[in-house]
Amino acid sequence: MALILGIESSCDETAAAVIDSNGASLEARIVAQRIASQDEAHRPYGGVVPEIAARAHAEVLSPMIAAVLADAGIGLDDLDAIAATAGPGLIGGVMVGLVTGKALAMAADKPLIAVNHLEGHALSPRLAEPSLQYPYLLLLVSGGHCQILEVAGVGQFRRLATTIDDALGEAFDKTAKILGLGYPGGPAVERMAREGNPKAVPLPRPLVGSGEPHFSFAGLKSAVMRAKDAGVHGDADIAASFQQAAIDCVIDRTRIALETASPGMTALVVAGGVAANAALRGALEGLAESHGLSLVAPPPKLCTDNAAMIGWAGAERLALGYVDPLDVAARPRWPLDENAAPVRGAGVKA
């Protein structure tokens, strides 16, 4: 048994959790977890304001950790390690969580594990589904990232596709802003889409059918803006048509990845905040079945940013003997596949 404290503060959720990992079997349970959302603070701005986010993390993180430890019925001395997000993300928020983790690790003389936030998402399906084995094909979809990767093990990622412009979650958020649906945009668009006709508005599917492995959503976002300005269609129809077009793009790229991935993939896995979208899950399930695979997706509460996934990634790393020095640096950019070539149009490693 290993008790891991997970700390997450990379964007606009402050989170802490205690994970109980059952040693070499790597089955785990969430002993306690808490999440504080900053939605109300950022809603007037239509998106996340980094300074507001960092201040909010600093205000609530320490008392939250004390509360989570109390919920778990343990003290700092009972922990086996402390895992904190070290990037990528908004650097102010990342540093709040990482510095807090370092201080606790030093005070309690416990190992520190600096976790890549994206690896937290990538490994979270194994927390929800212990039978999931490496290697698997991962679709990682969130507000800042849209990637397809082969996951061969902890720290072993091969990127097959990424976005050349907007991430999928960013496209959802911008569509919500265009339609006046507020923040956070993803859930708002999904709710409104249920009331609309997904075939009502003829929106483009960028790069679909081209054989291009990478994603592009900027043109779709622009088409949504033109549809709104035209005033011909209602917001529900625009939302439904956007969601269907976005899903069609994702299915097209994921199909390409399934056909070009290394042999032996055990499952198609989806993770990240947008993985909570029910329509996307349904489409991916059908795609996985057509390729003789099962779809593995965490429950919605583990799709959005949380500390349980950080604690779990820490548990997986600790089981392999991976720990970090107390002077480990925060990283605003931290690709899972550090050997991946720069992407055309993006200008950076995504």
UniProtKB/Swiss-Prot annotation:
UniProt remark on cofactor binding: Binds 1 Fe(2+) ion per subunit.
Q: Which GO terms describe its cellular component?
A: cytoplasm
Predominant cellular place of this UniProt entry's protein: cytoplasm
Q: Which SUPFAM superfamilies match?
A: Actin-like ATPase domain
| Compartment(s) where it occurs, according to its Swiss-Prot or TrEMBL record | Cytoplasm
GO biological process terms, semicolon-separated: tRNA threonylcarbamoyladenosine modification
Q: Which UniProt keywords apply?
A: Acyltransferase, Cytoplasm, Iron, Metal-binding, Transferase, tRNA processing
Catalysed transformations (reactions)? L-threonylcarbamoyladenylate + adenosine(37) in tRNA = N(6)-L-threonylcarbamoyladenosine(37) in tRNA + AMP + H(+)
Q: Which domain of life is it from?
A: Bacteria
Looking at the keywords, is Transferase present? yes
In short, the EC number is: 2.3.1.234
Instruction: Report the top EC class in one word.
Output: transferase
Needed cofactors: Fe(2+)
| Alphabetical list of Gene3D superfamilies matching this protein | 3.30.420.40
Q: Which residues bind Fe cation?
A: 117, 121, 305
Name any one GO molecular function.
Answer: iron ion binding
For this protein, the record's Pfam families field holds: TsaD
| Binding sites annotated in the UniProt record for substrate | 140-144, 173, 186, 277
Which InterPro entries does the UniProt entry name for this protein?
Answer: ATPase_NBD (IPR043129), Gcp-like_dom (IPR000905), KAE1/TsaD (IPR017861), TsaD (IPR022450)
Family named by the database record: Belongs to the KAE1 / TsaD family.
Protein task: Required for the formation of a threonylcarbamoyl group on adenosine at position 37 (t(6)A37) in tRNAs that read codons beginning with adenine. Is involved in the transfer of the threonylcarbamoyl moiety of threonylcarbamoyl-AMP (TC-AMP) to the N6 group of A37, together with TsaE and TsaB. TsaD likely plays a direct catalytic role in this reaction.
Protein name per UniProt: tRNA N6-adenosine threonylcarbamoyltransferase
- UniProt lists the gene as tsaD
